[in-house]
């Protein structure tokens, strides 16, 4: 089992990375409309009086401390949403009880990661013969200072198992419990590339939309194309 205490800390480095979000999930305007936590609380209370869907839009706010939300940055909503709208099925470094912001070193890597998971999910939907999905491509600027460097772990380690996330989950839980900022690790879906698993959105300084990408599924993801230029 990987001991996070034995992983080296990353030095300060301001980087650009990429991710995809399904276009059916709009940005959460409330996160982007305020400059700090005090403004957020005031506006949230006011909107809650007239908007019965507000809680569904903002997600489970109890899962993230207000101090962790990077209010005032471009794309605060995109940075925060993974921590309030948590996939209960979990992910590589989460058991489903907390959120993780996943980033990739290139858009091709982000596409490869999403392609794999979309293929796996829709292949289990009985009777589905064709579907079209549109994703927003996001460009994220962040500082990896203080994160743990899991790229020193060989790809043969169980945390990199392509399907069994049990060991990666255990590592993620220990990193989360230790209040570490996140991990840099090797992409399992695009050899030679890196990904990041942020346990908090605090390192993010900007996250903006670039292009839209279309995926066509007809038994498998048969095509991916950009449908709007960066």
What kind of feature is each model-predicted range?
Residues 1-65, 69-94, 116-230:
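Active-site and NAD+-binding cores of ADP-ribose-processing enzymes
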Residues 105-107:
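Internal, conserved structured core segments that host functional sites
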